[in-house]
């Protein structure tokens, strides 16, 4: 069988950078949605009970943290891509792409959950203060989804560079 001379390794950095972009873009989309959705709830609740605004800002902060998770993975991936210094194979590019997608999509889904729960939670908290602890617990479980994506993203990005013995 004749070799075409194209191994695919020339395109590997594209997939690596695509993974970095996916991590940041999807995580920030989740953070933006969560911040906006829960922020609307805080604003409408603040009209009725202005003394609870600072207490109800928790979902907005938790949603903002999701963007940091994407930034962490994007930095890890982008520092691992240097085809001039060392060989960067297609396996490495795919490992970085899957790392970015795992973190980014987990951050997106967590942001949607935090936004919806935060919006409903702060509005309900204005009427029944006993619901605050329950809201926080649900928000923690939603944030854990993004943490799972961050952990898997770190594991997958650490696999890059293990494709061939050098």
UniProtKB/Swiss-Prot annotation:
A molecular function annotated in GO for this UniProt entry is: proton-transporting ATPase activity, rotational mechanism
Q: Quaternary structure per UniProt?
A: V-ATPase is a heteromultimeric enzyme composed of a peripheral catalytic V1 complex (components A to H) attached to an integral membrane V0 proton pore complex (components: a, c, c'', d and e). The proteolipid components c and c'' are present as a hexameric ring that forms the proton-conducting pore. Interacts with APD2.
Q: Which residues lie on this side of the membrane: Lumenal?
A: 1-13, 78-96, 157-166
What's its membrane topology? Multi-pass membrane protein
Feature type site, description Essential for proton translocation: 143
Task performed by this protein: Proton-conducting pore forming subunit of the membrane integral V0 complex of vacuolar ATPase. V-ATPase is responsible for acidifying a variety of intracellular compartments in eukaryotic cells.
The subcellular location is: Vacuole membrane
Name under which the protein is recorded: V-type proton ATPase subunit c4
């Amino acid at each position: 069988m004749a070799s075409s001379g194209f191994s695919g390794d020339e395109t590997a950095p594209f997939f690596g950078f695509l993974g970095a972009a996916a991590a940041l873009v999807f995580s920030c989309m989740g953070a933006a949605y969560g911040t906006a959705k829960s922020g609307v709830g805080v604003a409408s609740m603040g009209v009725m009970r202005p003394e609870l605004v600072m207490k109800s800002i928790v979902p907005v902060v938790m949603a903002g943290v999701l963007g940091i998770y994407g930034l962490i993975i994007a930095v890890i991936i982008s520092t691992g891509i240097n085809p001039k210094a060392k060989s960067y194979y297609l396996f490495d590019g795919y490992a970085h792409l899957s790392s970015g997608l795992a973190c980014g999509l987990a951050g997106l889904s967590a942001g949607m959950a935090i936004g919806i729960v935060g919006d409903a939670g702060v509005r309900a908290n204005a009427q029944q203060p006993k619901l605050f602890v329950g809201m926080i617990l649900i928000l923690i479980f939603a944030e854990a989804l993004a943490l799972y994506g961050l952990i898997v993203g770190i594991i997958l990005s650490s696999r890059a560079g293990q494709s061939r013995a050098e």
